[in-house]
Curated annotation (Swiss-Prot):
Keyword line: Aminoacyl-tRNA synthetase, ATP-binding, Cytoplasm, Ligase, Nucleotide-binding, Protein biosynthesis
Motif 'HIGH' region mapped to chain: 30-38
Primary subcellular site in the record, as a coarse category: cytoplasm
Top-tier EC class: ligase
Family affiliation: Belongs to the class-I aminoacyl-tRNA synthetase family.
Pfam name, any one: tRNA-synt_1f
UniProt key word Protein biosynthesis: yes
Organism in which the protein naturally occurs: Methanosarcina mazei (strain ATCC BAA-159 / DSM 3647 / Goe1 / Go1 / JCM 11833 / OCM 88) (Methanosarcina frisia)
Name by which UniProt lists this protein: Lysine--tRNA ligase 1
UniProt keyword Translocase present: no
GO biological process: lysyl-tRNA aminoacylation
SUPFAM superfamilies xref list: An anticodon-binding domain of class I aminoacyl-tRNA synthetases, Nucleotidylyl transferase
Amino acid sequence: MADTIHWADVIAEDVLNKSGKHLVATGITPSGHIHIGNMREVVTADAAYRALLDRGADARFIYIADNFDPLRKVYPFLPESYAEHVGKPISEVPCPCGECANYSEHFLKPFLEALRRLGINPEVYRADEMYRAGMYTEAIKTALVKRNEIAKILEEVSGKTVAEEWSPFNPRCNECGKITTTKVTGFDPDAETVDYVCACGHSGTVPMAGGGKLTWRVDWPARWAVLGVTVEPFGKDHASRGGSYDTGKRIVREIYGHEPPFPIVYEWIMLGKQGAMSSSTGVVVSISDMLEVVPPEVLRYLIIRTKPEKHIQFDPAQPLLTIVDEYERLREKFRDNDPSMGEFEKRIYELSRATGICHPEIPFKQMVTIFQVARGNFEQILQIVKRSGFSTEDEKCIRELVDNVSKWLELYAPPFAKFSVKENVPVQVATLSELQKAFLGAFADLIESKGKISGEEYHMLVYSAKEKGSELNRLIAEKLNVPAPQVDPKDLFKAIYTSILGQSSGPKAGWFLSSFEEDFLINRFREASTYSPEKRE
């Protein structure tokens, strides 16, 4: 049975069964390149937030950068010198490029810029600042006092034994700066301090405010309570039986006296044949990199069109164009107020768009053709865009699309999507039949007589050649000095591509031909129609 209500609206309806204010939260650890797999979490949260607002809910949307998490290991993209920083909060690890305040900002800055380009504008929290500001102090105190109760919950839900020396709080060593090698030896609730001993040999006392952090399975429910989170998307790994959401539900209720947020569990985005994306394994296409290739609204559409619980197969090469085509067809139906467009499709389109981002009208595939015809020259591109019937008023948006296409051609385009316009009649024209050459001469005459022709008209004209009695068929017959010839349009398209590109195939013919000035086509086709290798020599 086809869906009639978008998943974001279903979530909003469920959430609104609980009255009051709503806080949609999302959080990602900026430990490496934040990839489009991570993007699913933020776009999902944004869609739920917008659906709540559309229903008049009192709602906020926040993003928490978990930059107080430790550096887990020396990732493949790091030099071995980072071994000494393993175990330190990533907000206190040096920036890999030396230009950002710290390691976490190196990955966070491009991610936040990518969110802006996607039209996503949450309130941004940084975990290290939250801890230092004392936002977690009461939660830390409660966790330390109720350590045994939390341990019991963890054992009952996860089925794993909690070590006797386990503590819900990881102090940061004053000597080595690590939070993964310390053990709590005592705490003072009144002074709000924690005593510890570290594997480096140092022991000391740290304040609860900024002197360390709660372990993940306690930090998450503590955050729900501290901030009042009511909705949160998260990956399926956290939703497994006995996983962090299951333990979090018990902890937030029994330890902190709050309700857990409405869960939106999402599946992974799979990168081609390489599997699920992961910053730590290097199977990744960063959001920033992808925004250099694809318009923002298409990336939003990739997430919005699919229910969170279904995995998404993503391939930035040729299959990407299928996604782009889908979105552009939706855009066209919406623009034309197509009666066949139902409310479900309209909702997908609405949630894929966002204010503050470019909405170019030119189809991506058509720009792939235009870019290569113009050899990347922006002024020529603008001329072709105008000649193709599109507005050139918003040059900024056109330039963004041009940049997307340029990068896609450079990084991902399969060989058959690439071409170059030959400056002279290609030698391959010698392989054309007499009928094909006659067609080129006749086509040149027809273009000259008609003047300006649209892409669609070019396409229809070529196909008209097979119709006996059509103007083009008659002109071909005159060139060959025969009665109405039998014509296969496939041979004619081959002649067009061969005469311009020196190859037997190319982009969609209508778009392709309308990208050229008529004089170029007339001259090229006439030259090709009389071409012979001897003549060229």
